[in-house]
Every structure is written in structure tokens, then in C-alpha cells.
């Protein structure tokens, strides 16, 4: 079933929910989080351990994810997002603020970021890629759909763009394109 928290939630141990988890305020999880349905956090979210979501993930504030992240559905972030572990999404990812991925990122749908974006590991996008701020991609990049950068872009690794590329600022590719 669904669990609803009417305020902030601060959990010290592992969190496992068999259905959907709604938190109207901030959510702080000091260990692993497993939710078989959707996870919705109205405020900021911090997860110290690994996160596995069977449905969609939605966060209304700044997000700090320190472990691996696996989401079966779409992920939406209304603030900045920082992910330290590997990220795997079976849907789309939309972040209105800046996004920092300190490991590999795999998104089967579209990846849309409104602010600056930094990806330290390899990035694979099954749909379109759109970034509104300056972009720094430090490893290989593979994008199946259209790719658009509204500001400067710097890519250090090999790049495979299977559809069109639009860049609104300076573009620097340090490897094969």
C-alpha cells in the first residue's frame, strides 16, 4: 500500500516500502531506500545509500543522492540534483536546476536539464538530450535522439550523436565525434 508522511521524514536505517511513498516535506534517508512504487518528496531529498524505485521518482527541492540510483519510471527534480553513484533510469529524467552526475548515467528516455550539467562518467541517452546551461561531459557520450545545448559544451570522451546537434555557445570535443 501507499505510505504518506505529512511533514519531513528522517530515517536512520534502511527504508523499504511495498507501495508508493509520499513525503510532503523534506526526505532524509541515512541508508538504502527501496520503494516498489513511486517515491514523491515535496521538499529536498538526501539519500546516503543506494536507491531503487520501482515506479517514478519526483523531488520538489534540491536533491543529493550519494549511492547508486535505479528508477524504473521517469525522474523529475524541481531543484538541483547531485548523484554520486551510477544512475540507471528506464524512463526520462528532467531537472529544472543544475545536475551533477559523478558516475555513469544511463537514461532510456529523454534527458532534460535546465541548468549547468556535469557528468564525470560515461553517459548514454536513449532519447533526446537537452541542456540549458553550460555542459561538461568528462567521458564517452552516446545519444540516440536529437541533442541540444543552449550554452557552451565540453566533451572529453568519444561522442556518438545519432541525430542532429544544436549548440548555442562554444563547443569543444576532445575526442572522436
Residue spans of the language-model regions?
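Intrinsic low-complexity, repeat-rich intrinsically disordered segments enriched
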Residues: 1-177
